[in-house]
């Protein structure tokens, strides 16, 4: 089904290893994989190059993977002196909650993330440069 495609979008929930399996199959078929995330007030996208580092390098366990991605973003942004204090507060609050609630998402970040995906897909299709994991796209309405 994914034969002869240049890119795929992996927006699967990390409730099992299926997203990792999907990435592996795409890598074997030389397909870029876009991983979009809705962080409420921000959109995040990373593109996994078929020959590059897998997203699974953040954690090989699917449970809580979205949180690992958010923590990675926080660490990366802090390293480059662009801390996202609001996201840090959201992550800490989420970690304190009990139960298996999904991460908080807002429609505004869905639109932001869709734009990031559209631009990345355009760049892949036209042979332009695209940030590849471990680099990423991050666009926030909050500072």
Residues of each region from the PLM?
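A short, aliphatic-rich alpha-helical micro-motif
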Residues: 2-3
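E1/E1-like adenylate-forming module used to activate ubiquitin-like modifiers
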Residues: 6-108, 142
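Glycine-centered flexibility sites
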Residues: 40-43, 114-115, 127
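Mid-domain beta-loop-alpha active-site segment that forms a flexible
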Residues: 105-125
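Phosphate-binding loop/pocket of nucleotide- and phosphate-handling active sites
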Residues: 123-143
